[in-house]
Curated annotation (Swiss-Prot):
GO biological process, one term: proteolysis
Enzyme Commission number(s) from the entry: 3.4.-.-
Recorded GO CC terms: vacuolar membrane
Pfam families: Peptidase_M28 (PF04389), PFF1_C (PF22250), PFF1_TM (PF22251)
Protein name as catalogued: Vacuolar membrane protease
Region: Disordered, residue numbers: 574-611
UniProt GO MF annotations: metal ion binding; metalloexopeptidase activity
Species per Swiss-Prot/TrEMBL record: Aspergillus oryzae (strain ATCC 42149 / RIB 40) (Yellow koji mold)
Principal location class: membrane
């Protein structure tokens, strides 16, 4: 009977159950916290710091969101007055001077500006519409808390007065909402945060060193007009840095969208719950994110340096009636508030001159320039910040040191005669015998191991996009599950097939070699982009590449544990000599091709004795003198796994754990939050006209990156996890292909506007949205019954279908005024040149437009200010937008054009939907929409009434 040497149980051995269990534990131990951090907002403290009151902030938010309050609504004026009262209440509640002196500080002077004087003409909006001109009158509310290092004079009252102290700090929010949303997170939380900042920095112990300007701007939703007109107020010359508070979702965590530089980002590190990645900033820089915030005005036009902090999901509630307090929480308020307090406190307490220097834009404030930054959070509790040139240096160093280290290690292995890699055979000491090493086995499997799962997941992205493109809107995690399950199962299946056909102890090192090459190339690309384009979003590649390099180096160091190739050949010859006395012949090693197909793959349940030929530790096959003889006593080396190469008995059995810990955790920690953040941001952009394929391919790419660290080990998996994932894949695939893509918690947004020809009384209500859903919804409305709903592709919103029908006539103007009187205009044409003066007004509105069929060369609004920081560089203007702080105001606009007639329309807007019955077509749409659909504004006005004009050559 054969004697067996059974190995001791090793919980870290590179065998099936340890590999399956440990890798599963590592992935789950990291993925679960990442998901929790992404979806669970830290609880607000029961006892907030001195100077802050969360309950008060929540009560303010409820008042602010008790109705729609766009700029062109009566409630907007109510909110404006309420803000002034709240600010005065906060300032009136500040303690006496003695309490400040007890803390060795002076009570700060506070100035409140109700800016109902500033106006401005700008061009292009935020969408780079070259043919657009905008005149806007602001109603901003500005609070200036004087810093104890600031000028004590009222310099802003002097003509052309400028501050002589160091630059101050601006914190901005906007108090207007869209006409279809209550504005809880866009931007109600920002507004109540600013109110709390006024309270905090006027509380004893928090007096600022630098001046603090808190801006409540009005008109952000209509192309950032409030921030633009703020530039005309004298106090705007004081701040050099800023913090912009914004919202593009409903609840959740407030993320750091972007920042201008390393120095200004530093104070954000004080935040107790930092959240965000520089990758989102790169999205804005490269144009992948098209929407904008007031950040671009402060940083791009005014030359300030600052940060953009905003809520960013779920986008389905953004600009709808679900952007309310019901769908946010005190915890979300605290998350933004705590970040704002920490960041602002860091900025106003700065005692250096790093935010003072030459202007970085023409006409900008003298804020100097900063260094480009790399930043990201770790589990929502730690913020990592360093300069971009540091990342560049680290990448270059790793790109050079890594290959050199591996080269020198290879040389050392070669000198020690232990370089088994890529070696097919070895010679004995006397060089008479040649023994097989099979050192190349396993090298060529990685392209299949990596390529097949990746190609299939990308193929799934195309399949779902073709069959059910918007399922990701409501079921992003079903898509994630499908991709992950398919990738893991296919990677395991391919690796098991390869391992069955050609088992190799070098599967790990060769897989890591391929991974190292791919990550090295990725690091080169990241280095080039960081150096030439200033894009820091590839920072995760450095950590990914570093982990793979160390794991690969460990595999190289493992080879030192092997016998020299000559020594191994001598062992085989010695074993052959001992066996020849028994009539044995030299057989194949455990990984030889000959006879592999007939040999059953060893598993945990396979007999150690097996059947047929049996091998010794040196993998020589013992056979009896004849086929009926009893086999000689043999020794089976348990340190050789399955049918892998015999020399692998000497390889360490535990180092794979170290390699796993060097590759998987760092990849998940770096890439996991990016994946969640990115998909949360783009999964619901299909309803806005974005192509859904991008989101699915992004999931496939992130899946591949996060699961690639499994490839060196996955061939050791038991079948249990892969087969379970196969079932998950089949179930989620079917669901993703057939399920309805929208739900009452993830609604499809439909863009609404009603256009009225005031000369004829004919109106057209329009929904713009995804086909075929928008057409189905439009046809089901009672007012559309019996009509032919006309649908055509939207001219401005890409990939959206615009469906129109004759709606119920609106009643935005009280009284019995004829429709054509809703908009009034008078045109006076010059007698000697192509110039004309328009006098325009509208009833119960403060927003109108002049549209031209052919562009005018220039225009001027009477009484308007102009600013070279907002230059006019277009060939002509097709549209002039007019905004007034006064209801039923009359604008006087002079235009000039080339020779010929001038045709167009004068349009006025109505955006107030707080009173039922005023806009009955919209009331009907909201009442009869299915639960999975939501209304959002399709234009600045919910109702747009127009009257045509024509100026002939002889007029």
């Amino acid at each position: 009977m054969a004697s067996l040497r059974l190995p001791r149980a090793n919980p870290l051995a590179f065998t099936r159950w340890p590999v399956t269990v440990i890798t599963a534990i590592v992935y789950l131990a990291l993925l679960i916290p990442l998901l929790v951090v992404h979806h669970v907002v830290p609880s607000a403290p029961s006892s907030p710091p001195s100077g802050l009151n969360i309950s008060e902030a929540w009560a303010d938010l409820q008042v602010l969101t008790n109705g729609f309050h766009p700029y062109n609504s009566r409630r907007n004026d109510v909110i404006h007055s309420w803000l002034l009262r709240r600010i005065n209440e906060i300032l009136d509640s500040t303690p006496l001077e003695q309490e400040y002196r007890a803390l060795d500080e002076e009570k700060p002077d506070v100035f409140v500006f109700d800016d109902v004087y500033s106006n401005l003409t700008t061009y292009g909006g935020t969408l780079k519409d070259a043919d657009l001109g905008v005149y806007f009158e602001g109603t901003n509310v500005i609070v200036y808390i004087r810093g104890w290092e600031d000028d004590t004079e009222h310099w802003w009252e002097a003509p052309n007065g400028v501050p002589t102290s160091r630059g101050g700090v601006l914190v901005n929010s906007h108090y207007d909402s869209v006409s279809t949303g209550f504005g809880a997170t866009d931007d109600g939380v920002g507004v109540v945060t600013c109110l709390q900042l006024v309270k905090y920095f006027t509380t004893p112990g928090h007096a600022p060193r630098r001046g603090l300007v808190v801006l409540f701007n009005n008109g952000e939703e209509d192309f950032l007009n409030g921030a633009r007109v703020y530039s005309q107020h004298p106090i705007s010359k004081l701040p050099h840095t800023f913090l912009n508070l914004e919202g593009a979702g409903a609840g959740g965590r407030a993320t750091l969208f972007r920042s201008s530089d390393f120095e200004v980002t530093g104070p954000y590190m004080r935040s107790p719950h930092p959240f965000g990645s520089v990758l989102s900033a790169n999205g804005f820089d490269t144009g992948l994110i098209a929407s904008q915030t007031d950040y671009v005005i402060f940083q791009g036009n005014m030359g300030l340096r600052g940060l953009d902090v905003a809520f960013m999901e779920p986008r389905a509630r953004y600009h709808t009636n679900q952007d309310d307090t019901r769908h946010t929480s005190k915890d979300s308020v605290w998350h933004m508030l705590s970040a704002a307090v920490a960041t602002t406190e860091g900025l106003v307490s700065d005692s250096t001159d790093r935010f003072d220097g030459a202007p970085n834009t023409d006409g900008g404030v003298p804020s100097g320039s900063g260094s480009q930054a790399v930043w990201f959070d770790l589990f929502g509790s730690t913020f990592v910040l360093f300069q971009l040139h540091t990342l560049f240096a680290l990448l270059v160093t790793l790109l050079i040191v890594g290959p050199l280290t591996l080269l020198f290690t290879s040389i050392a292995l070669t000198k020690a005669d232990k370089m088994y890699l890529f070696r097919s055979s070895a010679k004995s000491e006397d060089r008479l015998d040649v023994v097989p090493l099979q050192g190349l086995r396993g090298f060529f499997r990685f392209p299949f191991l990596f390529g097949i799962p990746t190609v299939v997941t990308v193929g799934l992205a195309y399949l779902v996009t073709k069959v059910n493109p918007y399922i990701i809107h409501s079921s992003a995690y079903a898509v994630w599950s499908m991709m992950v399950a398919a990738w893991v199962f296919l990677a395991w299946f391919v690796s098991r097939v390869a391992d069955f056909a050609r088992p190799s102890a070098f599967h790990r090192i060769y897989t890591l070699t391929w991974m190292y090459v791919l990550s090295w190339v990725s690091a080169v690309i990241a280095t080039v982009y960081a150096n030439q384009r200033g894009l820091a979003g590839g920072y995760f590649i450095f950590f990914f590449h570093a982990g793979i390099f160390l794991a690969k180096w460990i595999s190289y160091l493992e080879l030192f544990a092997l016998p020299s190739k000559t020594e191994y050949a001598n062992q085989l010859r010695s074993a052959s000599g001992r066996a020849s006395g028994h009539g044995s012949r030299r057989g194949t090693t455990s990984g030889e091709d000959d006879g592999e197909e007939a040999e059953e793959e060893p598993t945990e349940s396979t007999s150690l004795l097996g059947s047929g030929q049996r091998t010794t530790f040196a993998n020589y096959v013992r056979v009896g003198g004849d086929n009926h003889a009893v086999a000689e006593e043999e020794v089976i080396d348990p340190n050789v796994y399955g049918r892998e190469q015999a020399w692998s008995y000497a390889l360490p059995k535990w180092t794979w754990v170290l390699q796993l810990l060097l590759t998987a955790p760092i990849t998940l920690i770096m890439v996991g939050p990016l994946a969640l953040l990115t998909i949360s941001a783009i999964s619901q952009t299909g309803q806005d006209g974005g192509h859904p394929l991008f989101a699915y391919v992004a999931i496939a790419i992130f899946t591949t990156i996060m699961l690639t660290p499994l490839l060196p080990f996955i061939h050791r998996y038991t079948y249990h996890v892969p087969l379970f994932l196969l079932a998950v894949f089949l179930g989620t695939l079917i669901y993703n292909l057939v399920a309805f893509p929208f739900s009452d918690s993830n609604r499809l947004k439909l863009y609404y506007v009603q256009e009225v020809d005031l000369d004829t009384g004919v109106n057209s209500a329009t929904f713009a949205g995804l086909s075929p859903f928008v057409k189905d919804v439009s046809q089901e409305l009672p007012s559309a019954a019996g009509q032919t709903v006309s649908c055509e592709w939207h001219t401005k919103r890409r990939n959206l279908l615009s469906c129109s029908w004759e709606g119920i006539a609106p009643q935005p103007v009280e009284g019995d005024h004829p429709m054509k009187d809703w908009v009034s205009f008078n045109i006076s044409k010059s007698t000697d040149k192509p110039q004309a003066r328009f006098e325009v007004s509208g009833l119960n509105t403060r927003a109108c437009r002049i549209l031209f069929d052919t562009p005018v060369k220039n225009f001027h609004v009477a009484g308007s200010a102009y600013d070279p920081r907002f230059p006019y560089d277009a060939a002509g203007v097709n549209e002039i937008r007019l905004w007034s702080r006064t209801w039923e105001n009359q604008w006087t606009v002079d235009v000039d054009w080339d020779e010929g007639a001038l045709k167009g329309n004068v349009v006025c807007l109505w955006s107030d939907h707080n009173q039922p019955g005023v806009l009955p077509a919209l009331d009907e749409a909201i009442q009869f929409l299915p639960v999975w659909a939501a209304v959002t504004k399709g234009s600045d006005g919910l109702v747009e009434g127009r009257r045509a004009f024509e100026i002939g050559n002889d007029d």
